[in-house]
């Protein structure tokens, strides 16, 4: 951002803030056990990159970094509130239909897991903590929503439990049958989960009616990403040997059906699934020995084969991948570059790149999130502590906002 005027952060004097307003917005946080350091309302440094941005309704974003959650008013580039007391792990999940953010991880003063849910209004810029729940059994690391985002399953790594959150009524039910760092999926009234990430791996199937495990299937070594084809009733597990396919049909539950062998074995990959259940993509995780290539690999779960979406340039190597909630679009960080790749994941087509900010080379380079209409997106720039607002149709960065610290996870809820 060379040559960009630096804007000092302006902090509202707390004595000028209505005490009644402070209690109305902050009371739920104190009651729930989260620490609210102060009423912030800070003006953030912002770089305008294109005219006409003032008419766009961006809504609110939740960012995590440095042990702190920040709620950001994107329209006015203001930091609405900052929350401490929970250590988020791996992600923030937006529930667009309910205007809610779900954060999982563990409390700063506890080794047990925790789930916190924020109710927000993306137009009025109001918020409320409506759930702050402890999950016994160790930190909650991995998570997976169902295709409708009405439920999310979390895995507590200490005892291997599976915890299912109803995103509407906020009830949580616990099940046995997970493991250490489980990767999970929903299928009808079953939970599907791996038992670990390294070494020999099994896929467990848990009946939610009885709470009992009904199948346990060996799925090779380093069984990692898991997804389900709901139409065919099959689970797909990416492992070092390739993709293991396991039956979820009633009569053949747990039967190992076949192995889809990839070109590049021993690469440990994460899955991004589509709600339609017909196909899904994967990206290469940042592990020693893994290589990056100038294409995105997609598994057609109907035909049982792999398809490549080439970027057309050997320098454009997708790494961290994010799919839109409707499964129609994909964004990928490009290793070593400030560009973001855009993919049409329905037509399996590379749509080009849009320039953002710098990213640090790490296990998770940056996070990405789509606005509700899918015509815009936000990405974290971990190299300069900023977030970029991108116009995906024009393939342009139109705003960059500087944050007080390095953002790791980021999600947005925009007006309907």
Enumerate the predicted regions with their spans:
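N-terminal secretory signal peptides
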Residues: 1-21
